Amino acid sequence: MSSVLSVANPAVARAGMVQARPGIVRAEIDFLAPGVRRPFTYGHETPPGAPEPTARFVSHAVGIEDVRDRAPLRFEEHGAVLLNSPTQVRRFSDETHVRERYYGECAGIIQDALGADRVLVFDHNVRRGSALPVQAERRDLGRPVHHAHTDYTPRSALERLHRELGPHAEERLSRYLQVNLWRPIRGPVRDAPLALCDGGSVAREALRRVELRYPERTGEIYYLVHESGQRWYFASEMAVDEAWLFKNFDSAPTGAGRVAPHSAFTDPRHLHAAPRESIEVRALAIFR
């Protein structure tokens, strides 16, 4: 059973924190550079002899508000919610164990949080901070991503739905969402914490489609262009029994928080923290 987490963090601010005001950290996030036509990138390293990616980034300093110092975020309004969500799984380096045990646990957490009729967990990523080695042969291991993005667009979310439930599946549903459940493997998280952009502050035109090329297929994601009205949040000192649940796509035609772009960031208060280790699963939440 999971619940919305609203307990304040009692940690006292250290001297020398780089903050805009209490509860807000000022940090750099990379955004898609404006004016890039037909941006594309690769899901892994650029293949030998292939064109260089056209997606280019610009860094902006943004204020990132600690959710422990404010009212809890609401999933339908903001596109994200922080859950108090204990896990019984600890062997996150064992991919088979994760698929057999953790996927079902996550499906139950998401279904409980959203009231969905069905939840299909279809893949996951384990991410490690830059100081930890990454096994090159493990496609589920990677570095924290330090640019603002969503994992799906309307087109790629529909393709995923068809892949999981067959052609025309959307015609049998009242609503479907693509969501991520993100949690630390070790805590507290100080290195590369996850920042989420309030979905209600994201203009549609700030979301730009980017072609994501893999050896076997081509997908599509959104990169975010910076705008001054965007509001960013994070949860300080996240523990293993906490998890972010956030939207990458929502088929509902209205609602403020249709998506919640996300990015890792470097917290200037913790430049020498232990490298982050985290796992995120991606899932479809189905409403009949």
Give residue ranges: language-model regions:
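Non-heme Fe(II) oxygenase catalytic core, chiefly the N-lobe of the double-stranded beta-helix
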Residues: 18-221, 226-236
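Catalytic core of Fe(II)/2-oxoglutarate
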Residues: 221-288
